[in-house]
């Protein structure tokens, strides 16, 4: 057995005797996150708070256009924190497509936790394009027969269209003296992070915590102990990373927030005074984009869907 596989049976045995917010077998399809999902279940059982709702919200295009034979409608399903970026990019793409093809593209947009969005697409939300937090979520849609195998080879960077790293956002002046991952396990620290059941970003947060132990010489037992202790400091689990930010920034809960660094930079660009630390031991947060083959063929939107995906690069 590999280093990652050895503790799997032990952790699953623990899981069978404890209550969980999500089933372990529901995580087995995550690419490269099989063991992490199992350990995460154990850690979440220690969380002191409840979960947020897991519904996603569908939003109309910024500038709706009445349907006509000259219009094409494209449905984009994405994870929560990409909303601001897409709302800036989409009008530019619409303008370019109109100029090049004399056709107006009308976007339907849906944003929510990556896990929730994945389930919605599999359950019938007819996305033409999906931009999700994890390659494993895209692979779930592939396994459901909606995306053709090899999707990651059809575009640059193996399908990865956005990247970031994990950042620790603190209160002004950093009163808890947060310097690195290990500080999140202090009894006096309350941590805000999203719900891994519904948020791909929250799974990346977990990977950051886990990786901080493994990359500094710890083994799986130490990593499990650490993440379990950290999750005891989590009072509430919002449904996605954007809601986690609101819980921390607008509702004033918690001493520290784990979030994407690009989200923090966006807040600063909007005039927010945000203090944060990027831990030295970190993880590359890679977010894939893919055309949903079955749906674009049904809708007759393959050309524009592929054009939009290429435009994102």
Where are these regions (language model features)?
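Extracellular/periplasmic juxtamembrane helices and adjacent flexible linkers that interface
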Residues: 2, 49-53, 294-313
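Alpha-to-beta junction loops
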Residues: 124-130, 188-189, 250-256
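Early extracytoplasmic/lumenal segment of secretory-pathway proteins
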Residues: 47-144, 154-155
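A conserved helix-loop-strand patch within extracytoplasmic ligand-binding domains
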Residues: 142-215
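A bilobed periplasmic-binding-protein/Venus flytrap-type ligand-binding module shared by bacterial periplasmic
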Residues: 165-174, 286-303
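Short, low-complexity disordered leader/linker segments with a strong preference
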Residues: 1-72
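Ligand-binding pocket segment of bilobal, Venus flytrap-like solute-binding proteins
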Residues: 216-281, 288
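Ligand-binding cleft/hinge of the Venus flytrap
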Residues: 91-101, 182-247
């Amino acid at each position: 057995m590999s280093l990652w596989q050895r503790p799997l049976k032990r952790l699953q045995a623990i899981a069978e005797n404890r209550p969980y917010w999500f089933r372990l077998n529901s995580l087995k399809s995550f690419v490269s996150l099989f063991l992490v999902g199992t350990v995460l279940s154990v850690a979440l059982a220690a969380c002191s708070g409840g979960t947020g709702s897991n519904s996603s919200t569908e939003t109309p295009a910024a500038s709706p256009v009445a349907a006509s034979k000259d219009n094409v409608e494209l449905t984009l399903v994405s994870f929560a924190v990409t909303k601001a970026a897409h709302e800036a990019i989409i009008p530019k793409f619409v303008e370019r497509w109109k100029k090049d093809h004399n056709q107006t593209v009308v976007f339907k947009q849906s944003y929510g936790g990556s896990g929730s969005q994945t389930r919605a697409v599999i359950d019938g939300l007819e996305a033409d394009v999906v931009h999700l937090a994890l390659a494993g979520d895209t692979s779930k849609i592939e396994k459901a027969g909606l995306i053709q195998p090899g999707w990651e080879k059809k575009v640059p960077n193996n399908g990865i269209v956005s990247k970031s790293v994990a950042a620790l956002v603190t209160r002004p002046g950093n009163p808890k003296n947060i310097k690195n991952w290990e500080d999140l396990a202090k009894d006096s620290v309350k941590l805000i992070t999203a719900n891994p059941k519904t948020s791909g970003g929250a799974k990346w947060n977990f990977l950051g915590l886990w990786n901080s132990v493994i990359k500094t010489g710890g083994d799986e037992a130490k990593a499990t102990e650490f993440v379990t202790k950290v999750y005891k400091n989590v009072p509430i689990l919002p449904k996605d990373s954007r809601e986690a930010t609101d819980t921390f920034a607008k509702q004033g809960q918690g001493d520290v927030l784990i979030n994407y660094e690009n989200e923090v930079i966006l807040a600063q660009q909007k005039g927010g005074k945000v203090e944060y630390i990027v831990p030295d031991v970190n993880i590359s947060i890679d977010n894939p984009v893919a055309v949903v083959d079955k749906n674009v063929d049904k809708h007759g939107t393959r050309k524009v869907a592929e054009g939009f995906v290429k435009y994102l690069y």
